[in-house]
């Protein structure tokens, strides 16, 4: 590519990561990419934050919201919205909706395919570093222990006990 970046070997990526994102399962790359005329980075059809941190603004996530409901990240109460919640606290909201250092989807999710059914990446990209996420799915929730915070767990009913010295994640008020 003119900017020096290489295009990913999608055949290998998809072969090694059996849980494919919806458009990949439908063999519809054009749901997200316009290979002939997009002015956006990575030939995307709509906006998607290119960095790890970004202030939350729904306009920055137009690509995601063409398929996913915006409440996935904008609703503080996660019941009926997401399985990624601690009791009723929507943990997508906690991570993404921060006014200055919201984590973008890429902080935890692999956009094309992953080994995890929830498209959880194995590593968190942070600058030139990659940290293991150490995600563990559990019957009523899950746990992770990336370098960005202490080990934490969550439960969809009730609340998970504090899993690290920093305590459970809380949204910025």
What function would you assign to each model-found segment?
Residues 1-173:
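Flexible linker/context regions in extracytoplasmic redox proteins
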């Amino acid at each position: 590519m003119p900017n020096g970046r290489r295009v990913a070997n999608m055949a290998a990526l998809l072969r090694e990561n059996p849980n494919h994102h919806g458009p990949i399962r439908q063999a519809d790359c054009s749901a997200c990419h316009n290979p002939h005329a997009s002015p956006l980075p990575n030939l995307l059809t709509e906006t998607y934050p290119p960095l790890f941190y970004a202030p939350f603004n729904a306009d920055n996530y137009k690509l995601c919201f063409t398929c996913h409901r915006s409440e996935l990240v904008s609703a503080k109460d996660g019941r009926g919205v997401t399985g990624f919640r601690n009791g009723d606290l929507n943990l997508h909201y906690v991570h993404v909706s921060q006014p200055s250092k919201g984590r973008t989807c890429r902080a935890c999710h692999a956009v094309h395919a992953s080994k995890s059914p929830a498209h959880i990446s194995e590593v968190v990209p942070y600058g030139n570093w990659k940290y293991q996420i150490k995600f563990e799915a559990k019957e009523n929730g899950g746990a992770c222990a990336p370098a960005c915070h202490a080990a934490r767990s969550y439960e969809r009913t009730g609340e998970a006990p504090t899993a690290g010295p920093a305590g459970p994640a809380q949204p910025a008020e």
